[in-house]
């Protein structure tokens, strides 16, 4: 049964590819001027079969498309000529902006609009990838300004708003989901936000969905940074509702991003450690993160009555690596710890004051190699990043307490991946 389904899907994909090839060939014959290398290039990314749709949006009744990230040299006449390649156009409107323009194209037939999304999304016009999607009014989305938002990281490139919403739809108060898209490349930025009407549902979603598979990747969930919203409803000067897309951009070309998120802010150097057992002490937590060897530890705090603690590092990259390595750790006092970013940045100008190595446990004791390893950590904190890298390479194979090998190199190349970690709020 499963094999038959796969065969059917492959056949549908082949038919779709053949149909697209036929359409593109016809477009080149009808509009050869558009395919001059300096004007319009072939597709540079896979087309969206149905656009990046909001929850509940019905494309079967839509005949309008949004075109974003349009090169400033494109005129309204040229835009109309480009989109007319997929079918007769009822109207075309180009709104010019300083950096990139946007526009709306209304077709007589929705099939022509669908084909425009499939064949023109990602096409390079004057070297700039154009974004094409279904156009719809903001009124089609629920107002989520007072809802509870969670951050979802490590998303697969193919995950759309609809797919993300579907993954969280089991939670009754889930109200919206949006994937953030890169304004320049038209590709997913690998993270998004999900809204909930009920705070408890949001917390439950974080607990249950963190680490679950969505498409081809395990996602990471946590509370969104304060101020990270989907954007307020906007209205144009004529009182009409402004069209806003689900791919993280509005019709004014602004990208709805989370630039101040801790994974993007070098001022964040503190790791939040949750799900701690009541018997875990500050010394226990210090020992654990010391053995990880992620970097120079400056402060360790534990709230035993609340089941969490904080570990502050010398640099942002060290903290990012500690989050990644900490989440891969086995149990600490019979519990799997959960690591993410602390909720406050380290104040500018904070002097570096590394903690000394933690007091040795009765078994095993800290060896001379452990102390040497910590001295190397202190040296790393004072060196140029390139020199740090060289020293890390030279430090391969150094063992520390608990048998952790290659403490300076293990997983360090994956710091960028660790930057998708999330924010915690008390």
UniProtKB/Swiss-Prot annotation:
- What Pfam family is a match, any one? RRM_1
Low complexity bias located where? 9-26
Q: Which residues carry this modification: Phosphoserine?
A: 250
GO BP annotations of the record are:
mRNA processing
Predominant location category: nucleus
> Where does it live in the cell?
Nucleus
Name the Gene3D superfamilies on file: 3.30.70.330
Q: Hey, what's the signal peptide range on this chain?
A: none
Family matches, as CDD domains: RRM1_PUB1, RRM2_PUB1
Record text on subunit structure and interactions: Interacts with UBA1A and UBA2A.
Record organism: Arabidopsis thaliana (Mouse-ear cress)
Residues of the RRM domain: 63-137, 148-226, 269-344
Q: Is Phosphoprotein found in the keyword set?
A: yes
Task: Cite the GO molecular-function annotations of the record.
Answer: mRNA binding
Region annotation Disordered: where it falls in the sequence = 1-26, 230-268
Stored InterPro entries:
Nucleotide-bd_a/b_plait_sf, RBD_domain_sf, RBM42_RBP45_47-like, RRM_dom
Q: Which SMART domains match?
A: RRM
Sorted alphabetically, the keyword list is: mRNA processing, Nucleus, Phosphoprotein, Repeat, RNA-binding
Can you tell which superkingdom this protein's organism belongs to?
Answer: Eukaryota
Instruction: Establish whether keyword RNA-binding is in the entry.
Output: yes
> Which PANTHER family has this protein been placed in?
POLYADENYLATE-BINDING PROTEIN RBP47B, TRNA SELENOCYSTEINE 1-ASSOCIATED PROTEIN 1-RELATED-RELATED
- GO annotation, cellular component aspect: nucleus
Encoding gene per record: UBP1A
- State what protein this is by name: Oligouridylate-binding protein 1A
What is the recorded function of this protein according to its Swiss-Prot or TrEMBL entry?
Heterogeneous nuclear ribonucleoprotein (hnRNP)-like protein that acts as a component of the pre-mRNA processing machinery. Functions to facilitate the nuclear maturation of plant pre-mRNAs.
């Amino acid at each position: 049964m499963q094999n038959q389904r796969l065969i059917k899907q492959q056949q549908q994909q082949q038919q779709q590819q053949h149909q697209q090839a036929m359409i593109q060939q016809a477009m080149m014959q009808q509009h050869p001027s558009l395919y001059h290398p300096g004007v319009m290039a072939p597709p540079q990314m896979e087309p969206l079969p149905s656009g990046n749709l909001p929850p509940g949006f019905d494309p079967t009744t839509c005949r309008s498309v949004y075109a974003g990230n349009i090169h400033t040299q494109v005129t309204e006449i040229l835009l109309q000529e480009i989109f007319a390649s997929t079918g007769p156009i009822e109207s075309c409107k180009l709104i010019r902006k300083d950096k990139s323009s946007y526009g709306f194209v209304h077709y007589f037939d929705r099939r022509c609009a669908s084909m425009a999304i499939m064949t023109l999304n990602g096409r390079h016009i004057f070297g700039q990838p154009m974004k094409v999607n279904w156009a719809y009014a903001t009124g089609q989305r629920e107002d989520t300004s007072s809802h509870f938002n969670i951050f979802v990281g490590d998303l697969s490139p193919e995950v759309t708003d609809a797919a993300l919403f579907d993954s969280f739809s089991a939670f009754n108060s889930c109200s919206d989901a949006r994937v953030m898209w890169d304004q320049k490349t038209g590709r997913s930025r690998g993270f998004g936000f999900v809204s909930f009407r009920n705070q408890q549902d949001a917390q439950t979603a974080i607990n249950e969905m963190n680490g679950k598979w969505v498409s081809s990747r395990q996602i990471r969930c946590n509370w969104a940074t304060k101020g990270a919203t989907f954007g307020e409803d906007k209205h144009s000067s004529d009182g009409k509702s402004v069209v806003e897309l689900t791919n993280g951009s509005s019709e004014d070309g602004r990208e709805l991003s989370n630039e101040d998120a801790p994974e993007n802010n070098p001022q964040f150097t503190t790791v939040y450690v949750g799900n701690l057992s009541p018997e875990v002490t500050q010394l226990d937590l210090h020992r654990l993160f010391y053995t990880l060897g992620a970097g120079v530890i400056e402060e360790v705090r534990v709230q035993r009555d609340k089941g969490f603690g904080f570990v502050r590092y010398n640099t942002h990259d060290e903290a990012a690596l500690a989050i990644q390595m900490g989440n891969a750790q086995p149990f600490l006092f019979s519990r799997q710890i959960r690591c993410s970013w602390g909720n406050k940045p380290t104040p500018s100008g904070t002097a570096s004051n590394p903690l000394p190595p933690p007091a040795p446990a009765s078994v095993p004791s800290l060896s001379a190699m452990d102390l040497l390893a910590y001295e190397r950590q202190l040296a790393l904190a004072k060196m140029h990043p390139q020199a740090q890298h060289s020293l890390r390479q030279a430090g391969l194979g150094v063992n520390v307490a608990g048998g952790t090998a290659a403490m300076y190199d293990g997983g360090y190349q994956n710091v960028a991946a660790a930057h998708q970690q999330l924010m915690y709020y008390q």
